[in-house]
Amino acid sequence: QAEAGEFGGGAINLTTASLPDENYLTAGVGISGDSETTAQLGYTYYGSKRDVFGFDDGTRDLPAALRDNGGELVDAGVLENEDTLILQRNNQIPANFSASLAGGYATDIGDTRFGAIASASFSNGWRTRGATQETATAGSLFTSSYGVRTENRVQASGLLALGLDFPQEHKIRLTNVFIRDTSKVARVRGSFESIQTPFEDLEDDRLTGPYDALSYESSYVQRQLITSQAVGEFEFGAVELDLRGSYSKSERDSPYERTTQYRFVGSTGGYAVNLGTPT
């Protein structure tokens, strides 16, 4: 089993059948959910039109005005992808969806047996979780914060295996694997600097406030693995020769993560961007 991940190197040995005993085709569709996420309140944000498939279309690329400014601050008005800064409340988080398709085919070409096995799967799932974090000074509770985190995870994978069996006990196998894992996270965290309201009274409302401070965080992480392996098994009388060659490429991209902090302003009864602690 191989998964897209963050690793520096290593060897991947792909061992799978490539000549099915009989031809087949299977398909499956699944829908699932949980009581804390499905059809409940969560947070998300608009990224790109292809987010549902786990691919960014360039919307999250670092704006040219920021990329070419030598690390200096720029006016927020020149940013072209401000939509990714705005977190939205979704009162009906969708159910999880998955689909799969697999098939195998084998035939004789003269004295040689040829076979192929292919499979593909796709899933789009959601998960909302809440967490409380507290800090204490000299034995007394100093600050307390409650956060809600909604993750939209899209996974896609595919496999294609080809095989040839020759009459002289020679075998050739070619296996290709593609795995992609995308995590889109929206997180809202509210905090009190002086403890007056028990958090047990607020958790069910999922951050309706008012809090002393609010933090909006968005992230988008794409991980991808592509690997191909060719194997040859040859017999020449008492001599056996095994050859193996493989190529793998793993990628991780986390474009343009942002955190925006707000402070509650009592005179206006609303929140203003906190410019004192930029991130």
Segments (PLM) and residue ranges:
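Membrane-embedded alpha-helical bundles of multi-pass transporters/translocases
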Residues: 47, 87-88, 104-106, 244-247, ...
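Transmembrane beta-strands of outer-membrane beta-barrel pores
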Residues: 31-35, 122-126, 178-182, 236, ...
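Short beta-strands and strand-coil junctions in structured, solvent-facing domains, enriched
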Residues: 1-3, 20-21, 33-36, 107-109
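Transmembrane beta-barrel wall of Gram-negative outer-membrane proteins
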Residues: 73-192, 223-230
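A beta-strand signature from Gram-negative outer-membrane beta-barrel systems
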Residues: 1-27
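Residue-level detector of the transmembrane beta-barrel scaffold of outer-membrane proteins
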Residues: 24-28, 115-119, 171-175, 231, ...
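Flexible glycine-rich, low-complexity coil/linker segments exposed to the extracellular/periplasmic environment
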Residues: 37-92, 268-279
